[in-house]
From Swiss-Prot:
It is found in: Cell membrane. It comes from Bacillus cereus (strain B4264). CDD domains: ATP-synt_F1_alpha_C, ATP-synt_F1_alpha_N, F1-ATPase_alpha_CD. Produces ATP from ADP in the presence of a proton gradient across the membrane. The alpha chain is a regulatory subunit. ATP binds at G169, D170, R171, Q172, T173, G174, K175, T176. The gene is atpA. Keywords: ATP synthesis, ATP-binding, Cell membrane, CF(1), Hydrogen ion transport, Ion transport, Membrane, Nucleotide-binding, Translocase, Transport. F-type ATPases have 2 components, CF(1) - the catalytic core - and CF(0) - the membrane proton channel. CF(1) has five subunits: alpha(3), beta(3), gamma(1), delta(1), epsilon(1). CF(0) has three main subunits: a(1), b(2) and c(9-12). The alpha and beta chains form an alternating ring which encloses part of the gamma chain. CF(1) is attached to CF(0) by a central stalk formed by the gamma and epsilon chains, while a peripheral stalk is formed by the delta and b chains. It is a peripheral membrane protein. The keyword Plastid does not apply. One of its GO terms (cellular component) is plasma membrane. HAMAP family: ATP_synth_alpha_bact. The keyword Cell inner membrane does not apply. This is ATP synthase subunit alpha. Residues 115-135 are annotated as: Disordered.
Length: 502
């Protein structure tokens, strides 16, 4: 067997030509300290603020503090397996969550992973959780109503699509009930709802999901949950994950409602992280950028211009107060960021006025321009009537000699309070709200006993469905008040068959 030198040299040349040198370079650091959901790593010289990093056991982290000789990382998962000396590497990515219509009807955690036991979510679309809010020229003024189905809100503090309306009150005053009723009322409104539960008990979140399912609202709702048992980083990230999922729909021309329940717990989680990262504390031990924490979240709610597709994202943030103190740090911050607030008062709640909305201190700064014409006509004097009733009510307790005008105001006020009461999970279509408020403000209910007002209203709505569908349809389609004669005929027609209690 003869060896030919030319063949060998040709083979060697071919090998050299085909040789590819692939070197994989990754920026790696070493964990020097770990505990309480925080790790400090040496190295990672080129890491970006907010970049995802990966520990050797596969757990992800978020680079937060970029210091001279180490990086402070918040750990997004179990941290008990991470040890001093472990390797941590850059990923080159900032944190993203899955988005898209595949998430609708599902319960997910702030990382977009399903927690409802219904299998994986088949979406490949993702969006970064931190993204700039739409600019001035990309927005349009709020002009379309978002009907909550709650008379006291739609009449007194109307909400428009693209608005940010704060719901504030002590614990156990019905804040979550207001949000759930609003979500349930969006059934035929082509609206996608996102309910973000921050620091809630898992049993509470389960009840919310079951309530939504029972009313058929889970078909257009995404639930994002970071329960009280989960680490602080997930509570901090939950609202951003929720708004990111909503933005995907908004930028595609859809209308979205995002409920944050509640931002007080997110602020507390952020305070915990900041103190563990050794950032200097400020007022109430919150870090200096706690205002920016909420402003950058709520500024992402917008009504987009027609050039951008005309979509909208409406935000309903919740804040829990301590003993009605709205002058604390976080409540005043969020009040100054939002376009109005709905105060829920515990004394009203416990006296049986539910929803316990305080008409005197609740405002909507931009919702008035979104209210339909019919509603603004019938609810025009409602706020003043209620305010003067509350004032007179206090004086009337001291003396019994009241002139007729004062007595009439007290009678009308008592009926107004009764009409604005509403049962749990019983949102009302706007046309029915308009008719009952018309009956109230035009004096048709003045001769109905106060104890019968609630029953009168329930029976009246049932009567309208079978005897005055044309009137309901006219208000629904034109969004304007029908002729006074039509209203009077309908109301008087029902009053003839209504039997007052003895």
């Amino acid at each position: 067997m003869s060896i030919r030198a030319e063949e060998i040299s040709a083979l060697i040349k071919q090998q050299i030509e085909n040789y590819q040198s692939e070197i994989e370079v990754s920026d790696v650091g070493t964990v020097i300290q770990v505990g309480d959901g925080i790790a400090r790593a040496h190295g990672l010289d080129n890491v970006m603020a907010g970049e995802l990093v990966e520990f050797s056991n596969g757990v992800m982290g978020l680079a937060q503090n970029l210091e001279e000789n180490n990086v402070g990382i918040i750990i997004l998962g179990p941290y008990t397996e991470i040890r001093e000396g472990d390797e941590v590497r850059r990923t080159g990515r900032i944190m993203q969550v899955p988005v898209g219509k595949e998430l609708i009807g599902r319960v997910v955690n702030p990382l977009g992973q399903p927690v409802d036991g219904l299998g994986p979510i088949n979406t490949t679309n993702t969006r970064p959780i931190e993204s700039p809010a739409p600019g001035v020229m990309d927005r349009k003024s709020v002009h379309e109503p978002l009907q909550t189905g709650i008379k006291a809100i739609d009449a007194l503090v109307p909400i428009g699509r693209g608005q940010r309306e704060l719901i504030i009150g002590d614990r156990q005053t019905g804040k979550t009930a207001v949000a759930l009723d609003t979500i349930i009322n969006q059934k035929d409104e082509d609206m996608i709802c996102i309910y973000v539960a921050i620091g809630q008990k898992e049993s509470t979140v389960r009840n919310v999901v079951e309530t939504l399912r029972k009313h058929g609202a889970l078909d257009y709702t995404i639930v994002v949950t970071a329960s009280a048992s989960q680490p602080a980083p997930l509570l901090y990230l939950a609202p951003y994950a929720g708004v990111t999922m909503g933005e995907e729909f908004m930028y595609n021309g859809k209308h979205v409602l995002v409920v944050y329940d509640d931002l007080s717990k997110q602020a507390a989680a952020y305070r915990e992280l900041s103190l563990l990262l050794r950032r200097p504390p400020g007022r109430e031990a919150y870090p200096g950028d706690v205002f920016y924490l909420h402003s950058r979240l709520l500024e992402r709610a917008a009504k987009l211009s027609d050039a951008k597709g005309g979509g909208s994202l409406t935000a309903l943030p919740f804040i829990e107060t301590q003993a009605g103190d709205v002058s604390a740090y976080i409540p005043t911050n969020v009040i100054s960021i939002t376009d109005g607030q709905i105060f829920l008062q515990s004394d009203l709640f416990f006296s049986g006025v539910r929803p316990a909305i305080d008409a005197g201190t609740s405002v909507s700064r931009v919702g008035g321009s979104a209210q339909i014409k019919a509603m603004s006509k019938v609810s025009g004097t409602l706020r003043l009537d209620l305010a003067s009733y509350r004032e007179l009510e206090a004086f009337a307790q001291f003396g019994s000699d009241l002139d007729k005008a004062t007595q009439a105001k007290l009678n009308r006020g008592a009926r107004t309070v009764e009409v604005l009461k509403q049962g749990l999970h019983k949102p009302l279509r706007v046309e029915k709200q308009v008719i009952i408020l018309y009956a109230l403000t035009r004096g048709f209910l003045d001769d109905i006993p106060v104890v019968d007002i609630t029953r009168f209203e329930e029976e009246f709505h049932a009567w309208l469905d079978s005897n005055a569908t044309d009137l309901l349809e006219e208000i629904r389609t034109t969004k304007k008040l029908a002729d006074d004669d039509k209203f009077a005929a309908a109301i008087n027609g029902f009053k003839k068959v209504f039997v007052a209690s003895e």
